[in-house]
Amino acid sequence: MKLPNSHNLLIASLLGLLTLFAGSYPLVKAQSEPKPGCQATVDKILQEIRSKGVRRVEFSVSKGTANSYRTGNPTTRTDVLDVVLIDDVGATTSNGIAISNIFASPKLLNNWANQIVKNCGNTAIVSFWISQSDISRNYYIQQDGTTIKEKCSQLDNTSEPIPWGLGLPVSCG
């Protein structure tokens, strides 16, 4: 059954108006990509470390320990995230050399620390460690949400608490 001409005209007019108006309104952009979560950020960094030749790397979070023996944290964050590069085959192997190269790049470590504190809402300190050694690089959150590398203090081991961002000569590098 064929619709009368007035109905065809009405439908065609409505379709024309819809087409006209659809083109005149800007499309609403979907919201930007959500910030990657803490776990996704850490996983990405661990994968990047592996891609640089490190065979094994692990991480752990020490909840609520950032202010232990320290004073002056400019934030309310309290967690320490440790990234451990495992050197179980020796410093002269390709794995050991890859670890040494990473630790020789404070800008790279600082970049990773900044990514972690940006996406891990309660992380105040990011520590990079070489397993089976005393070698670590520690990055402390600042008021602006970025991190700075730990500075070596001249304080002795009995000085408690240690000012934020300072480390004892034994542990800082």
Q: Positions of the model-derived regions?
A:
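Polar/charged, Gly/Pro-rich intrinsically disordered segments
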Residues: 50-96, 120-173
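Bacterial N-terminal signal peptides
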Residues: 12-22
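Bacterial N-terminal signal peptides that target proteins for export
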Residues: 2-14
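Disulfide-bonded cysteine motifs in exported proteins
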Residues: 29-33, 115, 147, 167
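N-terminal leader/targeting segments
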Residues: 25-67
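Intrinsic-disorder-associated interaction segments
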Residues: 10, 31-38, 98, 102-105
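Short, non-transmembrane amphipathic alpha-helical segments
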Residues: 97-122
